[in-house]
Regions:
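Extreme N-termini of proteins with methionine-enriched Sec-type signal peptides or N-terminal signal-anchor
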Residues: 1-2, 39
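Bacterial N-terminal signal peptides that target proteins for export
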Residues: 2-10
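Generic low-complexity segments that are intrinsically disordered, proline-rich and/or Lys/Arg-biased
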Residues: 5-6, 15, 37
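Bacterial N-terminal signal peptides
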Residues: 11-20
């Protein structure tokens, strides 16, 4: 029997790593390391971490909670009902939905796709917020945080674009269902990548996600339902 040389190397790889002092990082360990890099001291909190968007969020907000939880650990949560387009995207991509936020007290909160207090679940307190990722510009209604937190606001078309770019920087390959859903979020939020609401970063992220999800550019508008504006 002829053995492929790569097969022999694959069997020897664990021993090579052990002898060289290298250790393979588990998925949860990688999430913890990335959370520490992103949040700093706030990552050391022993409270459970929930990623949540505005009440009854858009597809971008709901799916961004899934992306943030995948990158940094914690639970993707939702306050209110998923919109029909969001449900359609998740079903099309075979991606599970965020969990309903039954209890927020005692949790650390990461906000995605929102940073104004008036848009939040009233149970969310400013003292709970440890991070904000949003594509909306800062305004007079922005949540007043009691202490320094990680805030990533970029004037792009979608929050999912920001998180996809973070995944690129971290070297994280999103699972195919999540990549598909993230693509749907960007297409949905930008109304089909319309020039008026789409940046070059949105197009770059959409192209990468489409390749990962196996969706052709010409299929985008027929694949994902758009939110009514």
């Amino acid at each position: 029997m002829i053995t492929h040389p790569l097969a022999s190397f694959a069997r020897l790889l664990p021993a090579v790593l052990l002898l060289s002092g290298c250790q393979l990082e588990s998925f949860s360990e990688r999430q913890a390391r990335q959370r520490q890099q992103f949040m700093g001291e706030a990552a050391s909190s022993q409270k459970p971490l929930l990623w949540i968007s505005r009440r009854s969020p858009t597809a971008d907000g709901a799916i961004s909670s899934l992306m943030a939880a995948h990158l940094y650990g914690g639970q993707a949560s939702i306050s209110g009902e998923l919109t029909p387009p969001t449900q359609a995207i998740l079903q099309r991509c075979q991606q599970s939905a965020p969990e309903p936020a039954a209890e927020l007290t005692g949790s650390a909160i990461g906000l995605v796709g929102v940073h104004e207090g008036s848009d939040l679940d009233p149970r969310v307190q400013a003292s709970q917020v440890v991070a904000i990722v949003d594509h909306h510009a800062s305004s007079s209604g922005s949540l007043a945080l009691e202490q320094p937190r990680r805030i990533d606001l970029r004037p792009w078309g979608a929050t999912a674009t920001i998180l996809e770019q973070q995944a690129q920087r971290l070297g994280v390959v999103l699972p195919k269902p999540l990549a598909c859903a993230a693509l749907g979020a960007i297409v949905n939020q930008t109304q089909g990548l319309q020039p008026a609401s789409t940046t070059s970063q949105d197009r770059q992220s959409a192209a990468r996600l489409a390749r990962r999800a196996g969706i052709q550019q010409a299929q985008l508008l027929t694949t994902f339902e758009l939110e009514a504006r």
